[in-house]
């Protein structure tokens, strides 16, 4: 402001501070709430799998947790996008920009998906939605694809029933999976590959492994 005033008053010919830029603000930590491994297991185990809805919900949550997938990519899957290649089951996701991304299925996610598909009876309908809405009157699946907002309502309800924070959301499971992977010795590079992130900086936003370390350090202040 001062130099601009001096330039206008022709006291100086140029503003020497015009090329100076303040420090760039860089976000180093995401805001998505995460769950501990124990609370994630608590949530999954709390789901009543004696119903089709329960089997669907458990499978959907497992796919997000164990493959770090975005909710849009998960609900966008067709039946054919859970497939066997060699001796392993795989997930195929359509990511942003129309790119396809394939991830081997974790054994828990594979088991939950198999149980869901057998009960739903949709294994042969390869070109149809994998995760579907349910008709309230009959309790049977409709041909309609589950929407991300349907998934969010389900997750909020499941979290409440399990006594977990209502703040968790669809993205929670992506962040939870990445953090748990890193805590158990996984590398940031491999987490990036599984999550299909363009940059490791994006993956790092989901990494909350330092949260516990930071708390331990703060607790050193013994007053």
Language-model segments: which ranges?
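Conserved catalytic core of the tyrosine transesterase superfamily
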Residues: 1-223
């Amino acid at each position: 402001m001062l130099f601009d005033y001096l330039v206008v008053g022709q006291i100086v010919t140029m503003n020497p501070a015009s090329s100076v830029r303040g420090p760039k603000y860089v976000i180093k930590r995401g805001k998505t709430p995460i769950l501990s491994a124990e609370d994630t297991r608590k949530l999954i185990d709390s789901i009543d799998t004696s119903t089709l809805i329960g089997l669907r919900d458990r499978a959907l949550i497992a796919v997000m947790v164990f493959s770090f997938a975005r909710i849009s990519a998960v609900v966008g899957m067709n039946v054919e996008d859970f497939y066997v290649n060699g001796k392993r089951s795989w997930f195929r996701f359509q990511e942003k920009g129309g790119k396809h991304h394939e991830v081997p299925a974790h054994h828990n996610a594979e088991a939950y998906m198999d149980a869901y598909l057998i009960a739903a009876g949709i294994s042969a309908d390869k070109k149809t939605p994998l995760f579907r809405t349910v008709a309230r009157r009959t309790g049977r699946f409709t041909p309609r694809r589950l929407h991300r907002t349907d998934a969010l309502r389900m997750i909020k309800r499941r979290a409440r029933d399990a006594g977990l924070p209502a703040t968790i959301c669809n993205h929670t499971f992506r962040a939870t999976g990445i953090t748990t992977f890193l805590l158990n010795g996984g590398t940031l590079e491999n987490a990036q590959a599984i999550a299909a992130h363009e940059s490791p900086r994006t993956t790092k936003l989901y990494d909350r492994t330092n949260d516990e370390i930071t708390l331990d350090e703060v607790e050193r202040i013994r007053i």
